[in-house]
Amino acid sequence: MNKIKLPPDVDFHEDIHLLVYRPRGLIDEAAINNILAVVERLEIGRRNPFNRFYDMSGATEVKLDFKYVTDASIHRRLSHRGRKSVKSAILAKDWDLLHYGHLLELLTQGSSIKVHVFQDRNDAAKWLGVPVELRAARASGEETRSRDAHP
């Protein structure tokens, strides 16, 4: 089985079927395109679906627009069609990220991708069914990172 080298802001927890994305700084089309490419590479050939936790608390600037977010959401909705249901939790406190997160919630309704936006890490962990410690561990340097993921 081939391994996928993950970028530094992505962890994959094979044991609990969870991808964690913790970007820092600017969130723009390039950043979103990069994480979508990682997600799609991991989805190829996987029998087990995996949930996603997007911790956007490290974002300092947002440069996105409505058309791009809509197009990216439609692309994901179509590329995930026919797959088992997954959850995508977005932790956001920035107004722009909250706005775009809620837009994603609306655009994915009725699809196999269930998106929910949270302002509280504990609520996101509970919704995903994972330990809250896992969500916060990397920020304190305690998490053992998986740098490679099997597709």
PLM features: residue spans?
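Amphipathic, Lys/Arg-enriched alpha-helical "gate/interface" segment within cytosolic domains
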Residues: 1-151
